[in-house]
Amino acid sequence: KNKGKVDGRLEGDHGGSAGILRSGKVSTWEGGQRVPAVFWAPGRIRPNTTCKTMASTLDILPTFTTLAGAKTPKDRDLDGEDISRLLAGRFDEARMEKVYYYYLRTTLQAVRQGKWKLHLPRPAKRPWLAPFAKNKHIHPKDDAAFGEPLLYDLEGDVSETTNVAQANPKVVKQLLAIAE
């Protein structure tokens, strides 16, 4: 605000800490994927509300198109979805069960559905990391190879500290089938 008026800018502040989330950028752990977003539209978005439903930057174009009262183009497919209902404070349960795919470059590394996130096995040699090899912000533990899928309950363990794959073999099987 400037003297009580908004000057028309859209600003973002992307700090260097992922807080309690595991790892950081250049990873498919939650610390590398989650980015907070702040939206402000008086009369359309209630102040001081929080939405924990997943969304993507791909959703920005269709959402802003709706908020502007325009129509999305019909001659092409848009990758994102209109999330204006979420911004208006209306929960979308169906969106919580959508499948989200976590890629690093061109390699599928994890799949999420609902509260479950499955990290797919990773080999010791990972060609997708070559461009980032000198990145000192990647923790060795988060870059380690593993031969079995790792399953996390993100509702109870957003920091991805406890692998619950052995206790939930049906969930692992279901998410592996989705990944294939």
Regions found by a protein language model. Give the residues of each.
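C-terminal cap/loop subdomain of S1 sulfatases and analogous C-terminal strand-loop tails that border
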Residues: K3-E30, I45-L150, L154
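Short, intrinsically disordered, charge-balanced linker/junction segments flanking boundaries
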Residues: T28, V172-E180
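Catalytic cores of eukaryotic secretory-pathway lumenal/extracellular enzymes that build
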Residues: R34-V35
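Short beta-strand-to-turn element immediately C-terminal to the catalytic PLP-Schiff-base lysine
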Residues: V38-W40
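Cytochrome P450 catalytic domain signature, combining two hallmark sequence patches
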Residues: W128, K170-K173
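Intrinsically disordered, low-complexity polar regions and short flexible loop motifs
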Residues: D157
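Active-site-proximal N-terminal segment of extracellular/periplasmic enzymes that hydrolyze or transfer
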Residues: T162-K170
